[in-house]
Amino acid sequence: VLSPADKTNVKSTWDKIGGHAGEYGGEALERTFASFPTTKTYFPHFDLSHGSAQVKAHGKKVADALTNAVAHVDDLPGALSALSDLHAYKLRVDPVNFKLLSHCLLVTLACHHPAEFTPAVHASLDKFFSAVSTVLTSKYR
């Protein structure tokens, strides 16, 4: 459960990311594919090479979904219901992949914003990404 302090940390960090969210989403997705090659199996139709326009575009979709989740942090199930359906019923993404991408998002954000990435912010973002992952996998049960 996200505390009020966690929500503040997540919102303020996301505000600082600003217009870079799509860029960071693409970078985190590319990092996920490089670090965890099994995640590539869901994208056989993508050019997965470094700097791929398809990876960047999908990373932007991920970032846009997270931006929506930040804006609706008090109702993540409502905000992410359609994405949960998509990933559970149509794409059938293995739930572990959300944890892997979350880790790579944390690494990417820490690389770009080291001064702001305090232990408290790290913990809050980790809890937020975990909450998002939980919602996205809730329809699997």
From Swiss-Prot:
Heme b binds at residue 87. O2 binds at residue 58. One of its GO terms (biological process) is hydrogen peroxide catabolic process. InterPro entries: Globin, Globin-like_sf, Globin/Proto, Hemoglobin_a-typ, Hemoglobin_oxygen_transport, Hemoglobin_pi. The modification Phosphotyrosine is found at residue 24. GO terms for cellular component: blood microparticle; haptoglobin-hemoglobin complex; hemoglobin complex. Pfam families: Globin. Red blood cells. The modification Phosphoserine is found at residues 3, 35, 49, 102, 124, 138. Residues 1-141 form the Globin domain. The modification N6-acetyllysine is found at residue 16. Heterotetramer of two alpha chains and two beta chains. Involved in oxygen transport from the lung to the various peripheral tissues. This is Hemoglobin subunit alpha-1/2. It comes from Mustela putorius furo.
